[in-house]
Amino acid sequence: MPVLHNRISNDELKAKMLAESEPRTTISFYKYFTIASPQQTRDALYQVFTALDVFGRVYLAHEGINAQISVPQSKVETFRQQLYTFDPALDGLRLNIALEDDGKSFWVLRMKVRDRIVADGIDDPTFDASNVGDYLKAADVNAMLDDPDAVFIDMRNHYEYEVGHFENALEIPADTFREQLPKAVEMLREHADKKIVMYCTGGIRCEKASAWMKHNGFNKVWHIEGGIIEYARRAREQGLPVRFIGKNFVFDERMGERISDEVIAHCHQCGAPCDSHTNCKNDGCHLLFIQCPQCASKFNGCCSEQCCEELALPEEEQRRRRAGRENGNKIFNKSRGRLNSKLSIPDPAE
């Protein structure tokens, strides 16, 4: 029986990926559809992806599939064909191609079965996730941005909004998607008569959010087809003004795609204009935060003098200290002035 999970160390896999000469293409996609046996589907799909040297992160659940992956360029069309024929529900599925891509986004394939492909926290048997808002294409998005009767809602987390967003878009301040949904309903009550336009990175969160808003009595709801990634690509192709400002945060080693030249965020240490996320080099911290080149040099890639001092300790002493505390993996929430427990590179399903 074939091995259906990775058995090689992360360090070895990363070194192997970095040594590759063939370029790779970063792709994301999702689909809400009924999967009768997620585990069986996962195992079959794992073999297909492994045979094509696909790396990345894939979640499957009874409600569908959510994937962010990296595919060798020479195998992209074969991948597309095999994905489309794997299940009739996936035939013709839109694939979001990365806007900026160094081919080093992933180095291992992780495929997991979960309760939901996006952790929404919804526990309402009457909720119909298929009753979604209408799609908006790039030209429609720009028209809506000029419509005084439209309100744009960013359904991403605070660290995503901080480095880039649509003009005048409302932030729903939260650390996870499940926290955002009830807050969005509460915050938008005063705009119930407006046109509600929801967006996210690639479309998966705003699609479900649009259904949730309709479930809660909002009638004029839209969401951007393919999210920020598809919008920016189509706007550029069609010669339209790109109305997204700043950088689009992405959930892989790149941590961001430049959409516009504006830098709207600031270094969390000195306040200089900067929108580059990084993780604290101290293995006992791994804080996700924004750091400018000057502070990176000053603090040796760490988030604080304390972490800088700890990083300089002998490795054995560092391990001893890490064992005595809850391992960090946190995100700095500048808007609330506190740290939040999270993965080093946040989970896109949260």
Curated annotation (Swiss-Prot):
Q: Which PANTHER family match?
A: TRNA URIDINE(34) HYDROXYLASE, UPF0176 PROTEIN YCEA
Quote the gene name from the UniProt entry.
Answer: trhO
Q: Which domain of life is it from?
A: Bacteria
Under CDD domains, the record lists:
RHOD_YceA (cd01518)
One matching Pfam family? UPF0176_N
Query: Per the database record, which ranges form the Rhodanese domain?
Result: 146-240
Q: Where are the transmembrane segments?
A: none
Stated EC number for the protein is 1.14.-.-
Give the Basic and acidic residues compositional bias ranges: 319-328
Top EC class for this record: oxidoreductase
Q: Which family does it belong to?
A: Belongs to the TrhO family.
What GO molecular functions are on record for this protein? oxidoreductase activity, acting on paired donors, with incorporation or reduction of molecular oxygen
| UniProt name for this protein | tRNA uridine(34) hydroxylase
Task: Write out the entry's keywords from A to Z.
Answer: Oxidoreductase, tRNA processing
Q: From which organism does this entry originate?
A: Salmonella paratyphi A (strain AKU_12601)
Keyword Oxidoreductase on this protein? yes
Q: What does this protein do?
A: Catalyzes oxygen-dependent 5-hydroxyuridine (ho5U) modification at position 34 in tRNAs.
**GO terms classed as biological process:** tRNA modification
InterPro entries to which the protein is assigned, alphabetical? Rhodanese-like_dom, Rhodanese-like_dom_sf, Rhodanese_C, TrhO, TRHO_N
